[in-house]
């Protein structure tokens, strides 16, 4: 599918960000609340950095890891820089972040919805299948099938009174100009 991007101009990324990418409901409150309580957050995605960097910056993630689309002379090449961030790479990121923060992996909460998230979800102390495909959800002890991302706050023991409802960015990630 990435090969279909071959020769598309880079400005298409800004158009997609503006017209097609929306934040999941509750994302801003989730991140603002966790940051206000001293949590470290990382966005680890099988998507592309051209999108995740802007999303991570708008929400205040501490780290962002995703696949890098290769570009040349202002156009996409239809190729992805190696290594590909897939199932094993997500586990490695969890291990790396936990080690860097001197955490036991059992102190980590990971969230995902696809088969490439299962390794990470099983490795984390709290692995949450969020609106996941049935084949993924059935392999996880914690599942959120309804509700928004603030459900993750309740799982961590926050009360609604602890939520930060006035986060700095409760809108779409902004395209670069």
Residue ranges and their predicted role:
Residues 1-4:
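Helix-loop "lid/cap" segments that line or gate small-molecule binding pockets
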